[in-house]
């Protein structure tokens, strides 16, 4: 019989977390599946030292945001709703229109919906970098290719 009192739950300290940079090419990927994988890495759930209340996640760079795919008829039917809090200030945008104007916003909104909506979630979201096209200014961080099915 082992002494179970000697086992302690590991809790990561913010100073001892080692962060890596990952890069993902969004070309031909399905939006929801890509966003859930990105959210996992941003949160740090892919690491053994995951601690729910500490930011243990890594940085993620997404390129080719304009070439993201959506399953089914979502390209025509999915809408984004916003309101300016003024009378008549409702704004409803179609995904197709948003992809043409600001393709980065589609991926950012999908990932934000999968992160916690609190101070930690806002801190995690700052580690997501989304770019239109293949160019990005983070070559100095030596990002590693992230496999997303």
Curated annotation (Swiss-Prot):
Q: How does it assemble?
A: Part of the 50S ribosomal subunit.
**What's the family?**
Belongs to the universal ribosomal protein uL13 family.
Q: Which GO terms describe its molecular function?
A: mRNA binding; structural constituent of ribosome
Which Pfam families does the UniProt entry name for this protein?
A: Ribosomal_L13
* Keyword Electron transport attached: no
Return one Gene Ontology term, BP aspect. translation
Q: Which domain of life is it from?
A: Bacteria
Under the heading CDD domains, the entry gives:
Ribosomal_L13
Q: Which InterPro entries match?
A: Ribosomal_uL13 (IPR005822), Ribosomal_uL13_bac-type (IPR005823), Ribosomal_uL13_sf (IPR036899)
Its function, per the record, reads:
This protein is one of the early assembly proteins of the 50S ribosomal subunit, although it is not seen to bind rRNA by itself. It is important during the early stages of 50S assembly.
According to UniProt, the name of this protein is Large ribosomal subunit protein uL13
What would be one Gene Ontology cellular-component term for the protein? cytosolic large ribosomal subunit
Q: Which UniProt keywords apply?
A: Ribonucleoprotein, Ribosomal protein
Q: Keyword RNA-binding: yes or no?
A: no
């Amino acid at each position: 019989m082992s002494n179970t009192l000697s086992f302690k739950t590991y809790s990561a300290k913010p100073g001892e977390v080692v962060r890596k940079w990952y890069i993902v090419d969004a070309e031909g990927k399905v939006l929801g599946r890509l966003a859930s994988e990105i959210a996992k890495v941003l949160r740090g759930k892919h690491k053994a030292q995951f601690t729910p209340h500490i930011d243990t996640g890594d940085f993620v760079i997404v390129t080719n945001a304009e070439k993201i795919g959506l399953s089914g008829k979502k390209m025509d039917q999915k809408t984004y709703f916003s309101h300016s809090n003024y009378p008549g200030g409702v704004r409803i945008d179609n995904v197709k229109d948003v992809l043409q104007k600001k393709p980065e916003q589609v991926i950012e909104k999908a990932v934000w919906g999968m992160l916690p909506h609190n101070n930690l979630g806002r801190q995690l979201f700052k580690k997501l970098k989304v770019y239109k096209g293949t160019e990005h200014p983070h070559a100095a961080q030596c990002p590693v290719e992230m496999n997303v099915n």
